[in-house]
Amino acid sequence: MGQEMSTQSDIQNEDQKGNKRNLKGTQGKNGLKERSTSISKEIVKNSFNNSKLRPGMFIQNSNVVFNEQYKGIKILGKGSFGEVILSKDKHTGHEYAIKVISKKHVKRKTDKQSLLREVELLKMLDHINIMKLYEFFEDNNYYYLVSDVYSGGELFDEIISRKRFYEVDAARIIKQVLSGITYMHKNNVVHRDLKPENILLETKNKEDMIIKIIDFGLSTHFEYSKKMKDKIGTAYYIAPDVLHGTYDEKCDIWSCGVILYILLSGCPPFNGSNEYDILKKVETGKYTFDLPQFKKISDKAKDLIKKMLMYTSAVRISARDALEHEWIRLMTSKDNVNIDIPSLELSITNIKQFQSTQKLAQAALLYMGSKLTTIDETKELTKIFKKMDKNGDGQLDRNELIIGYKELLKLKGDDTTDLDNAAIEVEVDQILSSIDLDQNGYIEYSEFLTVAIDRKLLLSTERLEKAFKLFDKDGSGKISANELAQLFGLGDVSSDCWKTVLKEVDQNNDGEIDFKEFRDMLIKLCNY
């Protein structure tokens, strides 16, 4: 808006100096109006083309009716606020876990704020080890949160079953937790209730042991210059600085230290017969390795626990440093990721071919890649992404892309001895600028999936129809300028200006986009 006003002011000054009489005549007014409108259209087009695309933009409080969109299959679990129902999407056949929260139990203003804050945080977080929210809607009686089905159950139940974990397995789990926490802290989000009950196993496959951090009801944004004061958390895992009412994001690291201690020993470091006794022991910060279970545990593992359970948060290890701790590197260095070569070749081809400046097409593809794919469909791509993510923070930076690109070419069987490093860097820079849809300088997990996935799989009729419905808010069968403005959060701009954007796709010049035009746009983008 400021840019627009400044530009119009410059035009007026120029006209006043050059030819004042034109401002008094009808032709002069029309000329100025036309130039002003032209500039407005150019500004909205630039705003649109420069808008940042994130998967969270597609999670809006929609008018979905549960029984029309989903079929409930069975109850997966119950809690004090509601229940989680295994449900099938009637249009795509995909299964989801839907958290159904009764509004009777969300009467207090603070409870509703907590729920809405959780939704907002999940909208912005995009990480392999953080639960993915697909949809959020409500009716007169309930709120609905739609997420993936994680069939492996809680880490808590796995601990009960195993009693304790081998060091290598404990390291694999805590590395993933720390990866998620590193990403969260980098984005100024603190969880504040990390515990085995809030860590789910993606599948029942004991070899993969992919974890997902859930339950962001107590999470919040934080500022590095300010301390938090709310005394919240769970007795066994709460940090002493939280009990004292002055703490920072490293309260999450304390919780990770407690979890690692439990994984290796089967016992909590701070125990008691009731919550009061537990909290008193937490307040002292004193724990012991003088248990029979710890006799066979390496000094390096104990060293990481010590650094995580430092009483003073200022000297407590950070999430990123913990992720790079020697014990974690040692225990996970031999993790072999068996990558399917045909999937690898296809993903490299798709990434290199992805070239688009058409924001609407990018947005539609991001929605389909991030919200309409299943865990099984993205399994191989997840392996490739994790192999490229050298520092384990859940994002790919420029250096990781360069190193990873070379490694993937080797895996594919290409001879990389004569590769021109400068040429590779140029190619990586082109890839980064093309697929960094939120323009933050990194490739997020969903961005990678979106551009690397099999186009034939992604552009199925069912997925295209569901994606079209996201844009077509009123169900008219056409996407209007107003609907586009609503999705991209630029609703204060006139619909006339949006029509300049629609023209790129609007083949029959009716000022709207029908399903055929929408489908053709995506097929053209994907060279499919």
From Swiss-Prot:
Signal peptide start-end: none
Keyword terms of this UniProt record: ATP-binding, Calcium, Cell membrane, Cytoplasm, Developmental protein, Differentiation, Kinase, Lipoprotein, Magnesium, Membrane, Metal-binding, Myristate, Nucleotide-binding, Phosphoprotein, Repeat, Serine/threonine-protein kinase, Transferase
UniProt-listed Enzyme Commission number(s): 2.7.11.1
Cross-referenced Pfam families: EF-hand_7, Pkinase
Keyword Protein biosynthesis annotated: no
UniProt short sequence motif J domain autoinhibitory motif, positions renumbered to this chain: 350-358
Sample GO molecular function, one term: protein serine kinase activity
Chain residue ranges for the region called Disordered: 1-36
InterPro entries: CDPK_Ser/Thr_kinases (IPR050205), EF-hand-dom_pair (IPR011992), EF_Hand_1_Ca_BS (IPR018247), EF_hand_dom (IPR002048), Kinase-like_dom_sf (IPR011009), Prot_kinase_dom (IPR000719), Protein_kinase_ATP_BS (IPR017441), Ser/Thr_kinase_AS (IPR008271)
Top-level division of the source organism's lineage: Eukaryota
Post-translational modification remark: Myristoylated; myristoylation may target it to different subcellular compartments. During male gametogenesis, myristoylation is required to initiate DNA replication but not for mitotic spindle assembly or axoneme activation. Not palmitoylated.
Residues the entry annotates as binding Ca(2+) 3: D472, D474, S476, K478, E483
Residues forming coiled coils: none
GO biological process: cell differentiation
Cofactor(s) named in the record: Mg(2+)
Region (J domain) residue spans: 350-386
Function comment: Calcium-dependent protein kinase which acts as a sensor and effector of intracellular Ca(2+) levels probably in part downstream of cGMP-activated PKG kinase. Plays a central role in the host erythrocytes and hepatocytes infection cycles, sexual reproduction and mosquito transmission of the parasite. During the liver stage, involved in sporozoite motility and thus in sporozoite invasion of host hepatocytes, probably together with CDPK1 and CDPK5. Involved in merosome egress from host hepatocytes, probably together with CDPK5.
Entry note about domains: The junction domain (J domain) is composed of 2 motifs that maintain the kinase inactive. The N-terminal autoinhibitory motif acts as a pseudosubstrate inhibiting the catalytic domain while the C-terminal motif binds the EF-hand domains.
PANTHER family: SERINE/THREONINE-PROTEIN KINASE
Subunit relationships: May interact with the pre-replication MCM complex prior male gametogenesis activation.
Official protein name in the record: Calcium-dependent protein kinase 4
Organism encoding this protein: Plasmodium yoelii yoelii
